[in-house]
Amino acid sequence: MQPLMGFFIAALRYEITGELDVWTKMLVIVKTSMLNGCAYCIGHNTTLGRALGMTDEQTHALEGDYRNSDLFSAADKAAIAWAECLTERHYHRDKTTMADLKEHFNDTQVLEITMVSGFFNFWNRFNDAMELDIVNRFKKSTELDPEDYVAYMRSCWWNAEDTMDGYQAKAAE
């Protein structure tokens, strides 16, 4: 099961490119994880966010009043607000959040933002229910060089003998 879950996580973060940039995906992942209170996901994803350039100030703003922060663009704020809306399940009552999102993102990007937040709502609950130990993976991610982000993500989920490159090579045959 780990390779399958790893595939989904890597795909939603980076491996399978869509129209949505990795920065926006990471903002959505971190905000969703914060709202769900999943210690494993918060620790791991804020560290990965740092590797992408997320500052401590931005992390704190995500926890607090990001809407009035000058640390995020209007598009960032719209994506964060939509993740919040999905996680807190008030999207049926809040049509303005979707309208704001569509001012900054096309339909494909809106779909990607929704998929990322939706998946991490599941993943946060799964990790909380399984009471995963954060120590080993978190320790590994704190030593992450931003240049090695993709290599790190691959190393988290596939066995050494069955790397993503190996899967890609087999698929090309």
Please annotate each region the language model reported.
Residues 1-173:
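Hydrophobic alpha-helical segments
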